[in-house]
Structures are given as C-alpha cells and as structure tokens.
Amino acid sequence: MFFNFLIPPNSFSSFPEYVAFVVSLSYALNATLLLLYSRIFGVEVKEKAFIPVTLSFVAIDFTSIQGLRLFVGIPAYLGVVILTSLCILEGLALALTSSLALVNASRRHLAATWIAANVASSGLFMAFVGVS
C-alpha cells in the first residue's frame, strides 16, 4: 500500500527507527485487512500460513513503493497511469499471496478487494503527496 509515502522520514531521529515503524505499520495494516476480509466474507484463515503470508505482504508493499519512487517527477497524466497500473499489479500479487492463507477464498474476489484497497490508498497518496 502506498500509505508509506505519507510518513515523512525526517520525523524520526534515525533511519532504522523509520524503517522499523514503516515495516510495523505495513504488517499491522495488511494483517488487519486480511482478518477483516475473512470476517466480512466468512472465510476461514489457515493459522499456520497467516504469519508468513502477512510478512510477505510487507515485501510486496516495499517492492511497489520502490517501483513508484522510480517515477517521481514525471508528468501528472503519466503518473496517474503508472500509479493505477501499480495498484492493479500489487492487488493481483496480494490476492495471490493472501489466497494461500485463506480456505476456499475466491481469487477473483480477493483481487478485486485488494485492488480497491490499493486504489483507495493511492487516492490518499495523490491527495496528500500528489503527482508532479
């Protein structure tokens, strides 16, 4: 999720504190979203797979964020296209990964849910940070 861009690195006394905070926040948010999905749609969670899957979400988040950082300073119209593409790609990756921790979950429904969550967080990103 692109919420990590909303946290300014200069608000921490050291870079390791910043990284620890962002990783913790990323894990907590993604784990909460996965549990919320399972409660709302009545899908059983595989307890043994939950922690490894949610930890992999952090890696997926940071891969997406690093991809987004490559495009800082591009024109706004192109930035929106790239941001939308990253939302879709990350949503598909998160859906595939989260299906490993859920019993009988629809991958299509998971993909739509994660893409919607990414679009919402990207809207926040564009509202607070913007695209140049």
From Swiss-Prot:
Key words of the record: Cell membrane, Membrane, Transmembrane, Transmembrane helix
Q: Where does it sit, as one GO cellular component term?
A: plasma membrane
Membrane in keyword set: yes
Predominant localisation class: membrane
Q: How is this protein positioned relative to the membrane?
A: Multi-pass membrane protein
Q: Where in the cell is it found?
A: Cell membrane
Per the record, the domain of life is Archaea
Q: Does the keyword Transmembrane helix apply?
A: yes
- TM ranges: 15-37, 49-71, 81-103, 110-129
Spell out the protein name for this chain: Uncharacterized protein AF_2164
What species is this protein from?
A: Archaeoglobus fulgidus (strain ATCC 49558 / DSM 4304 / JCM 9628 / NBRC 100126 / VC-16)
